[in-house]
From Swiss-Prot:
Disulfides per UniProt: none
Transit peptide (first-last residue): 1-16
GO cellular component entries: MICOS complex
Coiled-coil residue windows: 172-267
Main location: mitochondrion
Membrane topology recorded in Swiss-Prot or TrEMBL: Single-pass membrane protein
Localisation per UniProt entry: Mitochondrion inner membrane
Name assigned to this protein: MICOS complex subunit MIC60
Family of the protein in this entry: Belongs to the MICOS complex subunit Mic60 family.
Organism this protein belongs to: Saccharomyces cerevisiae (strain YJM789) (Baker's yeast)
Length: 539
């Protein structure tokens, strides 16, 4: 249809041209600026990248510069090196054939454009360029081939989107080239798959063969090492067993030898004992004869010597007891003088207590009674049935438990009262009572359940109170009690002062708790020291 219309236009133009109208018709020149510019840029870029890739393979410095500064140069170099280093060369040949066909196609397009430029006056039938994409199954194909097919499809889509109008002959040629390229790429894809499959089969067989060889070698080596280790272990076990049996045999021989030696020694010892007994019997008979003769008064002398030693022991005990009593009296007097000395603000009597405990324990040993009821110890009795063969007497009397003495009880109480604590003097106790004057006045104004406001109010109003001094009365108000306690402390009547303070109740009693504790400690120490002094004087 298009060809018939074009032929009619040509005939019409020729008919009109044969008519001499006196005017000349200028034929318009066919202009394809966009298409020519596109193909020029594409060919220039292809030549630039191809030359850069080729020269980069020869010069490493240029290759680094080219890949770092030119866009897409690094990806193209990696693609080229990938296909260049493959074990087979079928991809390179296929790519060269495809590139040659593309060059022919481009040259055909260029030649056709030049022909159209030379035939300015000829009018041809044109068609819009529309190429079909390359529909090739690339599911299991090479990744680089997938990229090439994708790039060609992008190029075909860009050509289709440009809506280029080309002559029918060129359109048919381009379409045929597209079909040939599709066929070649399909063949290339199949060839790649087949080559890859063959390569994998070959490589798999080589790996299996290599693994079998390694397995056989390792198996032989393992058997050899296992046999060697087993032989070595058997030799070691044999050697250890031999050593163990030799050692056991040696130990048994040594034990038998020691048993025989011990048996021989026992027999010799038994013989020696028998001989010693016979010898002792002979000696005893001779001594009895001598005793009945020249040593008849030896027993009397021995009894007199024993009586003398007993007298000396009794005298020594009496002297030691008297010395212990003297030292106890001295220590008690020392404690008395220290706790009654007003020049010392506080006194610590731990050292004196330790000496008193030591002397008390020593004195208790002297006062220890005999274990028998008659006053004599079993060891002093002669001809006792408990006397053994060697002359030792085992006392079978029941031990008597003596109750603790008053001295030890008083010392224990004194130690529990004063251990690690200081005893204040009378003057120090009086001074501390005077220091409680302000707090005592404040406490006398406080109600039973006072809060913070009550405390502050009592503190303020206590400033207006006066402390009562002088001859106290028998009244029970706080001022009279304070005055009586101060007067008793001034005359060293600590007992009455403590009774007055203890009788207080409420806040005044709570304020004086620490003072009561110190005063009671002083009174208890004084009473215990007096008890010790009386007990020592009665011993």
């Amino acid at each position: 249809m298009l060809r018939t219309t074009a032929s009619r236009k040509i005939v019409l133009r020729r008919g009109l041209a044969s008519i001499n109208t006196g005017t000349t018709v200028a034929s318009k020149k066919a202009s394809h600026k966009f298409r020519n510019t596109f193909w020029t840029i594409a060919l220039s870029a292809t030549a630039f990248y191809a030359g850069g890739i080729i020269y980069s393979q020869k010069n490493d410095k240029f290759g680094d510069f080219f890949s770092n500064n030119v866009p897409f140069a690094e990806d193209l170099l990696e693609t080229y090196e990938h296909y260049h280093d493959r074990p087979t060369l079928f991809l390179e040949d296929s790519w060269d054939g495809l590139k040659a066909k593309s060059n022919d196609l481009l040259s055909g397009l260029t030649g056709s454009s030049q022909t159209r430029r030379s035939n300015r006056e000829n009018i041809e039938v044109k068609k819009i360029l529309s190429l079909e994409p390359l529909n090739i199954e690339t599911e299991n194909s090479d990744p680089q081939l997938k990229e090439i097919i994708g790039s060609l499809n992008d190029l075909i889509n860009s050509l289709n989107d440009s809506n280029l109008s080309i002559p029918e002959s060129e359109f048919n040629s381009i379409k045929k080239s597209n079909q040939n390229m599709l066929t070649n790429l399909s063949q290339l894809n199949e060839t790649l798959k087949e080559a890859l499959s063959n390569y994998m089969i070959q490589r798999t067989s080589e790996v299996i063969t290599e693994l079998n060889t390694q397995y056989e070698n390792s198996k032989r080596e393992f058997e050899k090492n296992l046999q060697k280790n087993l032989l070595q272990e058997v030799d070691e076990f044999k050697e250890n067993l031999t050593k163990q049996k030799d050692k056991e045999l040696e130990e048994k021989l040594k034990a038998n030898e020691e048993l025989l030696q011990a048996k021989h020694a026992n027999e010799v010892g038994l013989l020696s004992i028998t001989q010693v007994k016979e010898f002792n019997k002979i000696i005893k008979d001779k001594i009895e004869k001598e005793r009945n003769g020249r040593l008849a008064h030896l027993e009397e002398i021995n009894s007199e010597v024993n009586d003398l030693s007993k007298s000396i022991d009794r005298s020594s005990k009496i002297l030691s007891k008297n010395e212990a009593l003297v030292q106890l009296t001295f220590q008690v007097d020392e404690i008395k003088s220290r706790i009654n000395n007003n020049n010392l603000p506080d006194v610590n009597i731990d050292k004196e207590l330790s000496r008193l405990k030591l002397l008390s324990n020593l004195l208790s040993t002297f006062n220890k009674k005999s274990c028998c009821d008659d006053g004599d110890c079993c060891s002093c009795k002669k001809g006792n049935k408990n006397e053994g063969k060697e002359g030792k007497i085992s006392c079978k009397c029941k031990p008597k438990t003596n109750p603790p003495s008053l001295l030890s009880v008083a010392l224990d109480e004194l130690e529990s009262t004063c251990s690690g604590k200081k005893i204040l003097s009378n003057e120090q106790i009086y001074n501390r009572w005077n220091l409680l004057a302000d707090d005592f006045k404040t406490a006398s104004l406080l109600p039973p359940n006072s809060g913070i406001l009550g405390q502050l109010t009592a503190k303020v109003f206590s400033l207006f109170l006066f402390t009562k001094t002088g001859n106290p009365s028998n009244a029970t108000d706080f001022d009279s009690v304070y005055a009586r306690v101060g007067d008793n402390l001034r005359v060293s009547n600590l007992n009455d002062a403590v009774e007055e303070v203890v009788s207080l109740k409420g806040w005044p009693h709570k304020v004086c708790e620490s003072w009561i504790e110190d005063a009671r400690r002083k009174l208890e120490v004084q009473r215990l020291v007096e008890i010790l002094d009386c007990e020592i004087r009665t011993l």
